[in-house]
Amino acid sequence: MKFVVSSNTLLTRLQAVSKVIGGKPVQPILDNILLVATEGVLYATASDKETTMEARIELESLEEEGKITIPAKILLDILKEFPEQPLTFEINTETNEVKIISEKGEFSVPGESAEDYPIQAALNDSSNDLTSKCGLILEGIVKTIFATANDDLRPVMNCILIEMNEDNFTFVASDAHKLVRYKRFDAKSENGQFSLILPKKPALMLKNILPKE
């Protein structure tokens, strides 16, 4: 596995997805970020088994496809040391050793097999896609997330309900003491009426990474 990628682009994407990783992962390998290089693109995935985030990074070049997992903290600490420049990643798939080659030298990082990384089950055919302006989703989260609860016994109260129809989007949150409903009439669903429940953790992550426009 061998590819070349922009150091700043990779760092920015990995900083975003790494926010998913919890302090005490249920499996040690979930401290790692899964990297999959294929067809000129690098996919970076982080998960805590409940929430999974994937970033897509265009590669400057891809010599050999493959996949590997690398400890998130080690990788991020290394990337923070580089000014913007192309970095070459060379991975020995037999030993899982990762070499990161820069303009001034190289680092060697121990990786782990991607085969051991738990992959989230694919969505079934009855699932709906939601495509919307980032600013709209961000505004809906900002206007309602403060009303969500922190209740382990009633986890649904820790979420935001998003309802979509042909007329508007509605965001609803409640902790059983207060109820907040926020409607946007400048958005609509083109797939009929449906709804989704967005847990607080991914909602907070989206709040922190989505651009306002």
List each language-model region with its residue ranges.
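Structural preference for solvent-exposed beta-strand-turn elements
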Residues: 1-213
